[in-house]
A protein has these predicted regions:
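Bacterial N-terminal signal peptides that target proteins for export
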Residues: 1-9
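Boundary at the C-terminal end of the N-terminal hydrophobic targeting segment
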Residues: 21-23
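N-terminal intrinsically disordered, cationic/polar leader segments
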Residues: 25-60, 64-67, 71-80, 84-88, ...
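Bacterial N-terminal signal peptides
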Residues: 9-19
Length: 191
């Protein structure tokens, strides 16, 4: 009986400790969607128009060492008056913060990415919210051992390059605020 009692106490302690570890996430581990916008700069970004045939335009948006890609894409969208677009990218980064959306908290849990990683894939879209273009992008990064991590891009620092191919569409897409999630979501019926 004494061994069973000790085993039960040990299991209870393990369960409580595991619960405390999970519940000890700090507020700094999360970011609200409204605070998840661009925070850096991309001074070395270069843009080339690849085609301007009807009805779409194709751009190559190239980032270099140290550029913050999310901020650069936002800058591109504003400078070129993008009202609707989608994009894909490959390249490499040296540090990023990705996010996983927690629907109960209505916040992104930060996923820190440190060191050099391959950008296996990045995709996203650009749509208007309150008359301004807003970039929404996700990224999957590869580790040296072949494992991957991914999520919503909060920030990503390029090293040595990130090659983004952007297709700008002729008809504007609009977003609306969704109070159930605190996210701005594309709404095809919005104008």
């Amino acid at each position: 009986m004494n061994k069973i009692h000790r085993l039960l106490c040990l299991l209870l302690w393990i369960g409580i400790t595991a619960g405390l570890c999970y519940s000890q996430e700090s507020a700094g581990d999360y970011v609200a969607p409204s605070q998840a916008g661009p925070k850096g700069t991309a001074p070395r970004m270069q843009v080339q128009l690849l085609s301007s045939g009807e009805p779409t335009q194709q751009y190559a948006v190239i980032f270099y060492q140290g550029d913050e890609a999310f901020s650069g894409l936002q800058e591109f969208a504003e400078k070129y008056h993008v009202t609707s677009a989608h994009f894909t990218a490959i390249g490499a980064i040296n540090g990023a913060t990705l996010g996983w959306f927690d629907p109960q908290r209505k916040m992104y849990k930060k996923i820190p990415i440190t060191g050099q990683h391959e950008v296996i894939g990045m995709s996203g879209d650009i749509a208007l919210y309150q008359g301004k273009p807003v970039v929404h992008t996700h990224m999957v990064v590869g580790y040296p051992d072949g494992t991957t991590r991914g999520g919503h891009v909060l920030e990503a620092y390029v090293s040595p390059t990130l090659e983004v191919m952007v297709t700008v569409d002729p008809i504007a897409m609009h977003k609306r605020f969704d109070p159930d999630t605190d996210l701005t979501l594309i709404d095809p019926s919005a104008k």
